[in-house]
Amino acid sequence: MSTEEDQKLFLSIGLDEKRAKDTLKNKDLTALLKTIIEEASVSKGCDKSIGNLLYSLATCQQVNSPIRSNVSKAIGEEKIKTTIQFQAATQYLKDNKEFNQDTFNDFCGVGVVITPEQIQKAIDDLFTKKATEISEKKWHIPIGDLLNPLKESLKWADLKEVKIMLDKKLETTLGPKVVEAKEKKVAATTTAPVKKIEEQLAAITLKQDASLPTPKRLKIRECSPKFANQRVEVHAWAHHVRNQKKIVFLELRDGTGFLQCVLSGDLVHPSIIDKLLREATVKIVGTLVIPPADKKCPGGVELQADYWELLGPSNADLEGVINQESNVDHLFDQRHIMMRGTRASSIMKIRSLCLFAFRQHFFENHYMEVTPPTLVNTYCEGGSELFTVDYFGKPAYLTQSSQLYLETMLPVLGDNFTITQSYRAEKARTRRHLTEFLHLEAECPFITYEELQDRIEFLVVDVCEKLFKMDPELILSVNPDFKVPKRPFMRMNYSDAIEYCKKNGIQKKLEDGTEVDFEFGDDIPEAQERRMNDQIGEPIFLCRFPAEMKAFYMARCPEDRTLTESLDLLMPGVGEIVGGSMRISDFNELVAAYKKAGLDTDEYYWFTDQRKYGTTQHGGYGLGVERFLTWMLKEEHIRNVCVYQRTKDRITP
């Protein structure tokens, strides 16, 4: 099918022209969406609502589920129609490897019809229950306080329809919405009751009580029982705001932790409290108290406020920027907002601690840190994965690896390491590939192949132990199942891995879709490698790969010159997180390797000189920090541990 025909197909299911064209730029997504359209039997076109759900399925994390076609079919048959049903369907894909129609129908609300009468009754019941609150707050009542209970009682209803009927009920109950009553002068035609409300709203200005003790300025991490019954001042963001009539519960966040705060009395007067929106920055002054034993608060304390002021306003439209119904692409378009969430911010803190733990490990073991260049004129791993840039009229590249530079530092510093960005023009669209990643690399002189494996093993275990000691609650809040891996790690030769795959039905897929056994010399792709790793269920050093499969600089095995002293460290759930090898130390052997790889020896003179002036047996490795975190935190996708991911399809924000 031509590109023009593909575009017509995508337009026929309701995609707008821009989204259709953007999809066509991604060959993998194009093929996937076409398959899903065929599975849904809507190749001749369909309603836009169906097409949007099919597109969301093509871009969701569970798209490669073996039972996905059943969801495609259900969408095409309009059994899955609402966003909440679609979310349930993708959760079903995540939780199940085999499909059962009855279980699926129950789980996703297939066939459940919520009538307008049922929606209206639920809204009427809610208004009866919240009559006093609605009467007092009127249009200032947070819409979430009404919508969230309705989401629970009307689980399978169309949320848009619920919102429309809820708005009508509010207008019937309260009259037309007065939008500017607090900030602008009331027009001459405004009714007297509205004028009275405005006068009340403008009547209060908060001031600190000068008779109270001067507050101590604290970061949230410092707020602990140590300062119980003391007056403190905290500057933070409003992480959550829960308004309950005459009292407001506020969860504060300043990057160092979370703190619960309680506001009451004049502090929650309608003239000021409506400005306290989620993500607003505030100054809160009050007394730290230890809550009752049955009340859990972060840090073991609660802030009873006696004064607050707005430092930086937020906006009510934040709730529409991202929410539970946002698809993955939209969430990562709004990554700068998404990272403020509890889980995402916890991952960013762990990422920071992880870098500290790696450096701590290296310095404790007498490694020195190196800061190599990332603009280079040679390559290390392979020319096809290079990003080329114009360097004053000459071609230059973004570095794939700093290994060659680290090797030149061996006679200068001995054991050395770097934590530097690396770049790979990866075309793979998988859950573990990035085009820019944080690359931890180390080079070590005077070691053996076995000692190299021991050092990598020690690094991984030691860093896990350090991280867990630093903040076990933080680690377990993200991955409750985390356990430090035990040494020694399993060692498996590449040849044994091929045999394992044969014996356990792990096969390679040919271009025509047929599956056959792996043979010696085959590269084991990510999916099959991960399947083997997950079956074994523990860390594995995959060792001694054939020379033809590895980079030019890797040393040959003395017992079999067709093999290399190479290794990949595989971790369950992720696969490879470390790649390493012993390096060629002989001058003549390295020159021969250049020629075999088609490299210009003159461009590598500075690297070759390491074998000319005092060579020695040495080895090193590279660890992908994001892959390490993905494994450690048991994340579904590597993008979740990136600050801002860079992949084949994403360069913003």
From Swiss-Prot:
GO terms for molecular function: asparagine-tRNA ligase activity; ATP binding; nucleic acid binding. GO terms for cellular component: cytoplasm; phagocytic vesicle. Its EC number is 6.1.1.22. The keyword Protein biosynthesis applies. Keywords: Aminoacyl-tRNA synthetase, ATP-binding, Cytoplasm, Ligase, Nucleotide-binding, Protein biosynthesis. Coiled coil: none annotated. InterPro entries: Aa-tRNA-synt_II, aa-tRNA-synth_II, aa-tRNA-synth_II/BPL/LPL, Asn-tRNA-ligase, Asp/Asn-tRNA-synth_IIb, Gln-tRNA-synth_Ib_RNA-bd_N, Gln-tRNA-synth_Ib_RNA-bd_N_1, Gln-tRNA-synth_Ib_RNA-bd_N_2. Pfam families: tRNA-synt_2, tRNA_anti-codon, tRNA_synt_1c_R1. It is an enzyme of class 6 (ligase). It catalyses: tRNA(Asn) + L-asparagine + ATP = L-asparaginyl-tRNA(Asn) + AMP + diphosphate + H(+). It is found in: Cytoplasm. The keyword Cytoplasm applies. Belongs to the class-II aminoacyl-tRNA synthetase family. This is Asparagine--tRNA ligase, cytoplasmic. The lineage of its organism: Eukaryota, Amoebozoa, Evosea, Eumycetozoa, Dictyostelia.
